[in-house]
């Protein structure tokens, strides 16, 4: 069983690498590095390598490795844990979104897609990472991971808190999608200065400036919602996992906002964009973990108040 968890952990790490590499492709405008050719690069296995081709083809290799590991985990789970429906669904979810992600990537190469569609590419990559992470978490629960008390899962979560966490997850996904759209639109610098946009409290609400400003407003509300979640969770003395998860979510959200503020202040480069992507991926991972913790585990006893 430890071998299965090791493979699942490797899959999670490769998924994270694929997310970051995809951000590298977008940030460096290397999506056309292999031309209109897929799965080959410029119509061959060994093209004339340039920077864009290396970045794009490297992303394909990492994504293919993620796909192979997802298949391995899915088959392994089905064979050794056939009675655990939730675990099998998580493993299948990983495989499903990897295939969907690969198909969307291939479509983008073979036929140019609008920015609204291209933004889905990053959103699906986050879901790939999410399911891979939760498979690893689920496998670790049987071994009583070090960050949990043995009795922690015996304390169910009140419906109000569950709704709060899942609502934040859905809202965050929409804000992330909007951020991906801003990047594909080339509007990351449409608002200069921070926190004002081009020196205005309310800039024109259309075009690249409007999209960028909408993302800022969405992120600001996300901060408020994360603060509310942390304030609620800090009182849950029976659930150390929820309290720590909410604290991590708050810390990562604060870092994410700071990294986003670097763009309009003149620090828009590959490093800061990868940092921004890495932080939101980490935040999303923590939030997904919190969602997982709200799922019922066995018989409910005493509800945790929100």
UniProtKB/Swiss-Prot annotation:
GO molecular function list: metal ion binding; oxidoreductase activity, acting on NAD(P)H, heme protein as acceptor
UniProt KW keywords: Cell membrane, Disulfide bond, Heme biosynthesis, Iron, Membrane, Metal-binding, Oxidoreductase, Transmembrane, Transmembrane helix
Cofactor: heme b
InterPro entries with a match to the protein in the record: COX15/CtaA_fam (IPR003780), COX15/CtaA_HemeA_synthase (IPR050450), HemeA_Synthase_type1 (IPR023755)
EC number: 1.17.99.9
Localization annotation: Cell membrane
Topology class, membrane: Multi-pass membrane protein
Residue ranges that the UniProt entry lists as topological domain Extracellular: 27-56, 111-116, 186-206, 269-277
GO (cellular component) term, any one: plasma membrane
Record pathway: Porphyrin-containing compound metabolism; heme A biosynthesis; heme A from heme O: step 1/1
A Pfam family per the record: COX15-CtaA
Membrane-spanning segments: 6-26, 57-77, 90-110, 117-137, 165-185, 207-227, 248-268, 278-298
Top-rank EC class of the record's enzyme: oxidoreductase
Sites where the protein binds heme o: 59, 121
GO biological process: heme A biosynthetic process
Reaction(s) the record says it catalyses: Fe(II)-heme o + 2 A + H2O = Fe(II)-heme a + 2 AH2
Binding site for heme b: 215, 276
Principal subcellular localization: membrane
Membrane side Cytoplasmic: residue ranges: 1-5, 78-89, 138-164, 228-247, 299-306
Disulfide bonds: 34-41, 191-197
Domain of life: Bacteria
Quaternary structure and interacting proteins, as annotated: Interacts with CtaB.
UniProt domain comment: The N-half (TM1-TM4) and C-half (TM5-TM8) domains are connected by an intracellular loop. Each domain is formed from four-helix bundles and they align in a pseudo twofold symmetry manner. The N-half domain is the substrate-heme O binding domain and the C-half domain is the cofactor heme B binding domain.
Classification via PANTHER family: HEME A SYNTHASE (PTHR35457:SF1)
Role played: Catalyzes the conversion of heme O to heme A by two successive hydroxylations of the methyl group at C8. The first hydroxylation forms heme I, the second hydroxylation results in an unstable dihydroxymethyl group, which spontaneously dehydrates, resulting in the formyl group of heme A.
Protein name (record): Heme A synthase
Natural source organism: Symbiobacterium thermophilum (strain DSM 24528 / JCM 14929 / IAM 14863 / T)
């Amino acid at each position: 069983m430890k071998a299965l968890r090791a493979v699942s952990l490797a899959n999670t790490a490769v998924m994270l690498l694929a997310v970051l590499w995809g951000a590298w492709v977008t940030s460096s405008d290397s999506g056309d590095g292999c031309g209109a050719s897929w799965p080959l690069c410029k119509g061959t296995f060994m093209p004339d390598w340039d920077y864009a081709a290396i970045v794009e083809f490297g992303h394909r290799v990492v994504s293919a490795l993620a796909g192979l590991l997802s298949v391995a985990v899915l088959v392994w789970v089905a064979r050794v844990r056939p009675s655990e429906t939730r675990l099998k669904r998580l493993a299948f979810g990983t495989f499903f979104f990897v295939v969907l992600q690969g198909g969307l990537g291939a479509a983008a190469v073979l036929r140019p897609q609008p920015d609204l569609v291209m933004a889905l590419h990053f959103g699906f990559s986050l879901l790939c990472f999410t399911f891979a992470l939760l498979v690893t978490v689920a496998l670790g629960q049987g071994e009583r991971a070090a960050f949990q008390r043995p009795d922690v899962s015996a304390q169910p979560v009140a419906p109000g808190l569950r709704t709060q966490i899942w609502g934040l997850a859905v809202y965050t996904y929409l804000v992330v999608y909007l951020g991906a759209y801003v990047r594909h639109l080339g509007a990351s610098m449409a608002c200069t200065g921070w926190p004002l946009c081009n020196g205005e409290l309310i800039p024109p609400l259309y075009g690249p400036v409007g999209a960028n400003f909408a993302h800022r407003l969405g992120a600001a509300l996300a901060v408020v919602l994360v603060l509310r979640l942390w304030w609620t969770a800090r009182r849950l003395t029976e659930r150390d996992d929820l309290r720590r998860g909410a604290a991590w979510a708050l810390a990562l959200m604060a870092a994410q906002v700071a990294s986003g503020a670097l763009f309009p202040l003149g620090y828009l480069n590959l490093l800061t964009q990868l940092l921004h992507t890495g932080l939101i991926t980490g935040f999303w991972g923590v939030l997904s973990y919190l969602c997982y913790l709200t799922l019922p585990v066995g018989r409910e006893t005493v509800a945790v108040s929100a």
